Amino acid sequence: MLDKSGIIKRLMLSNQKASAEIKALKGPEKPGLFAFQKHIHQYVLDKFLLDDEEGIQTDNINELAKKSVEKAGKLNPNEAALLDVSKHCGATSSYMTKKVLLYLALAEDLGVNLQKYDMSEIETTGELAALLYRETQASEHAFVYLDNAATAPVEDVVIDQINQRIVKCNANVHRGIYRLSEESTATYEKDRADVAVYLNATPNEIVFTSGATESLNQAARILSDFVSEGDEILTTVYEHHSNFLPWQQLALRKGATLIVATSAEDLESKLSDKTRIVAITHCSNVLGTYFDVKHICKKARETGAISVVDGAQAIAHSHPDLKEIDCDFYAFSGHKIGATTGIGVLYIKDCLIKKLNPSSFGGGMVKRCSIDDCTFEDAPYCFEAGTPNFVGATGLATALRHRSMREEDLFLKEQGLMKHLVKGLSEIKGLHLLSDAALHNQKQVCASFTVEGAHPYDIAMLLDKKGFAVRSGMHCAMPLMTHLGIEHAVRVSPSYRNTTEEIDRFLQALQEVLLICCRSDGTP
């Protein structure tokens, strides 16, 4: 037994205070997980000794567990969870049993109902501590996600539809003649048709891919036959690496020249009869500002160039009409719009898709294959080699269908949040915004900034400690970072899921973080 001499009375007096202190950790000044565990360890020690003094006087681990379970069973609804965790946390010593039992006593004091979890999946007390940490932060000052430009939370309706797809119709498409496969194929093609309707396109123009990166790489591979030595590929300094590297590498392979414009006007001035491809982002993932892709695609078409638009950011905050934009290619991912990762779209204009050859080969995209030759399926199927992500396609189509019912209101809310955010950031001393378009009644979907004397990584790390998720780094846009004369930046990207109150708390937390990172005069 632990030596309780001289400390029992103190523990009995301090135990309620210790519990109250831990409950107070739900507030905005919540600690990191490590600090949280330190608090729990002290609480566990106090609570165990107090319980021991009240009558559990045994070194026998089974007797200890039995008596504690009996006691806990009279006090809370976690009895089953208690038994499960004792079993699965490797409670092979008195110390481990004490930890398991008293973590659960703490859960009860904090009002955490563990019955909603499958406790058989908890294999260590560290995992149990992490679960309690997450639960205590699910309060009025919950974790605030502001990195939607990277990946958006999956919509509940998407999760429900994906679950139904897996449970009720999880069969390969375009292969079997049995009923389940035919149902799966019909669902897959309906999802394709719904995506096409949303984009004002036709189903045969919609190619499902693994995401925007694969879409753009596939476009570059497909278009390699259109590029020869001495030709030019035109892009901008604002591109995400996914719409820069494929064209850079294509130019290197073909002996062509990659021309990089520094503005929309500069891009237009660089168009020539040598331009074969114009690759441009619809919306910058760093600045959050839009390009007039309709005008740029028109100018590209007038010179005989093929236009490729990266819509990864734009699709999340606007409703692109591809007939109106009149581009040749358009690419985006599902995970930016509330669907899952691993699914995306490559739109290819009908008059062009029929002339193109596939760049990936395998099952599902071939009509006939002999030792010497083969013939391919018609578009878009010839561009979908292998088993497609038909479950992901359901998620993507569901996300677009769900959003289309209320998107005008959602987009308006986002712009209101962005204007509020950018205004608040603009008022912070020493903070340099890379774009303040929202303050000039222009659409802006994210805000990136640097701060004199503070490294973006430090800012993001400290904001995380305060419960805010933001992105820091080069944002997969090194050419733009070089053009702007910086190495890294902090990016804040809210969505319609956020609130004005969360933006206000973020701005307050940021100012507190900057007091740590910088002196009062903004210097290191």
Regions picked out by a protein language model, each given a short descriptive name:
Residues 1-139:
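Flexible, low-complexity inter-domain linkers and amphipathic docking helices that mediate domain-domain
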Residues 133, 137-524:
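Pyridoxal 5′-phosphate
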